[in-house]
Amino acid sequence: MMLTTLLDEVERLRAARPGRVLIGIAGAPGAGKSTLALALAAKLDHAVTVPMDGFHLANVELRRLGRADRKGAPDTFDAAGYAALLRRLREATGETVYAPTFDHVLNEPVAGSIPVPPDTEVIVTEGNYLLLDTPPWDRVRQLLDLAVYLSADDGPRVDGLLARQHAKGLDPDAARDWVYRSDEANARVVEATATHADLRLHRA
C-alpha cells in the first residue's frame, strides 16, 4: 500500500510536467528509506537511485575535524556537494553523470559509483536530512519535485539499527551506545523536518 501510494504520486507528477523529475525520501535512521527508494526505482522505467550517504565526509576528514564520534550528524556530510550534484542531475540531461555511494564494508564514501545515463527520467534520492532547513541543507529541498517523509515505529526501527551495528562487529554494549548516542540524536533532528514534506508515509 505504501509503495502503491508513492507510485501514484510519482506518476501524477510525471504526467503533469515534462523532463526529469527528482523524488526525495527523508526519514530517521532505520526508517526504511533505502528499501523504499530501491523498490520505487524498480517499479519505474528509466529510474536511478542516488543516496545522500555518498556524501559522507571521509573518515580521515572526520578525524581531522574532531567529528568521527558523531558520524551521521548533519555536519559530517558534504551537504553543498550533494545539492550541487542534484542540481547537475536536473540540468545535465544530455550526458552521463556519476554519483557517489557509501560502502558499508569500507565505512567510506566511494566516488563515481552510480552512473546516471542521459535517458534517466526519474532520480530517487534518499537520506536523513533532505528536508533540513538550515544552510546548506536547505538547497536540497528546493531541488526536489516531490519530497516524501517516511516514518516507522520506534521499536522495530531501533532494533534494525542495533542489528546494523552488530553486523559491523560491535559488541552489544558498543552497539547500544552508538545507536542511542548518535543515531537516535540524529533521529530527533530528522523528525522535526517532517512538516516540510509533500507526502508523509509510515512503515508499520
Language-model segments: which ranges?
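ATP-dependent NMP and nucleoside kinases share a basic, alpha-helical "lid"
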Residues: 106-164
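Extreme N-terminal, non-catalytic leader segments
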Residues: 1-22, 28
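Conserved nucleotide-sensing/catalytic segment adjacent to the nucleotide-binding pocket
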Residues: 51, 58-106
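Conserved lysine of the Walker
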Residues: 33
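Small-molecule kinase domains that catalyze NTP-dependent phosphoryl transfer to phosphate-bearing small molecules
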Residues: 111-112, 135-138, 166-204
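Residues at the beta-strand->loop junction immediately N-terminal to the Walker
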Residues: 26-29, 126
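Post-Walker A helix-loop "phosphate-sensing" segment adjacent to the P-loop in P-loop NTPases
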Residues: 42-50
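Hydrophobic positions on the alpha1 helix immediately C-terminal to the Walker A/P-loop
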Residues: 36
